[in-house]
Amino acid sequence: MQVIETLAQGLKRELKVVIPADEMEARMNERLVEVKDRVRINGFRPGKVPVAHLKKVYGKSIMADLVNEIVREKPTEILTSRGEKSATQPEIGMTEDEAEADKILKAEADFEFTVAYEIIPPIELKDASGIKVTREVVDVGEDEVNEQIERIAESARTYESKKGKAANGDRVTIDYLGKVDGEAFDGGKDEDAELVLGSNRFIPGFEEQLVGAKAGDEKTITVTFPADYPAANLAGKEATFDVTVKDVAAAAPIEINDELATKLGLESVDKLKEIVRGQIESQFGSITRQKVKRQLLDQLDELYQFDTPERLVDAEFENIWRQINTDLQQAGKTFADEDTTEEEARAEYRKLAQRRVRLGLVLSEIGEKAGVQVSDDEMQNSLFQQLRQFPGQEKEIIEYFRNTPGAAASLRAPLFEEKVVDHLLTEVSVTDKKVSKEELTAEDDADEKPAKKTASKKKAAAKADAAEGEEAAAPKRKAPAKKKASDESAE
């Protein structure tokens, strides 16, 4: 077998592989001898069929199998011998000339094929001790815990129907139909919708006009959708809602005590406080983790600069671009609404794709050199988390991960990445800084705002961490249900 390099440009490689006809014929004859005793042909005793006759009957079929085996196995062997790793599955090229292909199958011509691929660039690991990150820490105080418990108690509050007019704090049950320019619009209709007046769940002006209403009342409410409403076809538009009030209910008083804890399935209010404190600490810890990780990745991105395999970047860009267009479509917006153009957005997200690929390769190399491993138990736990997100679809999900090429790798990748980050945090300088809840969440809130042209680079950088999964929140279906897109993102 002869291997000739025909292209070495940047990360691109192309090889020409030639296996002489006599070598292919020798392999075929070996295979014929192997099957000789198992073949049954009329007129011949078992094991007595001449090889020449077997070749005449089965030669081309066996040669075709050999060709398939060679193109399936040899590229990996060749790359290993060259000390190279292909970024993606190599592309195999063979003759499309039927006459030439027939000669190969008859061992009358050399078998030639090409292997085209992009190599993963060699990465020389650098000293990470100069990297400095700040870990923001929030002390969870009693006030924070009590506020959260009050919100829990509020969500568990009961209401009792009352006669008379609705006031702020009362819950009204309504049917409504929204119209713009006299025409009903998608998402503008609901029945038996429950709304606590004063909760500011609906768009400005909606709830205020229901104060004083009684069960059985029919009202027409006029409101104006906010200019930044996520559904572009409604943003800034005046709308009317035909509302039927079906019930008015007064809120029952709530008390934070052992009785409340019992309703929630806990033995005491102290246990409730303990659980709530743990949940808050976990939430703050997740934000802190992402901010530390972002700092780490930003500095790694500055530390490592090298060409990235084009095919990996193309694939990553397509994933990003598909999500961006889905988000825009769901929000009823265009690139112009985001103060940019499709061309500018493509360029920006192309840079993001390059960054993701580069950081992915760096983290992979660091993890490999550090001996980072993802255990079977960790994979199993990750799969269970997936199953919990989709109750009733457990069988389909398990089948998907079992039968879909690359599915298990997609489950492993974020686990591996987080473990590499853990490893790096033992090597870099980490300084703890106590901050308030508002300081901790301020930057994250800013990242959730619509990506205007001036903010697009910042948002792109924030999204470069593949594990963060930051995506624009999809707008709710019911038109009056939220007053701002940013409110939706918070839910």
UniProtKB/Swiss-Prot annotation:
One annotated GO molecular function: protein folding chaperone
One of the protein's GO biological processes: 'de novo' cotranslational protein folding
Record key words, sorted: Cell cycle, Cell division, Chaperone, Cytoplasm, Isomerase, Rotamase
EC number(s) recorded for this UniProt protein: 5.2.1.8
Compositional bias segments (type: Basic residues): 452-461
InterPro entries membership: PPIase_dom_sf, PPIase_FKBP_dom, Trig_fac, Trigger_fac_C, Trigger_fac_C_sf, Trigger_fac_ribosome-bd_bac, Trigger_fac_ribosome-bd_sf, Trigger_fact/SurA_dom_sf
Xref: Gene3D superfamilies: 3.10.50.40, Trigger factor ribosome-binding domain (3.30.70.1050), Trigger factor, C-terminal domain (1.10.3120.10)
Signal peptide: none
PPIase FKBP-type domain residues: 169-254
Location(s), subcellular: Cytoplasm
SUPFAM superfamilies recorded: FKBP-like, Triger factor/SurA peptide-binding domain-like, Trigger factor ribosome-binding domain
Cellular component GO terms, alphabetical: cytoplasm
Main localisation: cytoplasm
Protein family (similarity comment): Belongs to the FKBP-type PPIase family. Tig subfamily.
Domain statement: Consists of 3 domains; the N-terminus binds the ribosome, the middle domain has PPIase activity, while the C-terminus has intrinsic chaperone activity on its own.
Stated name of the protein: Trigger factor
Lineage, uppermost ranks: Bacteria, Pseudomonadati, Pseudomonadota, Alphaproteobacteria, Hyphomicrobiales
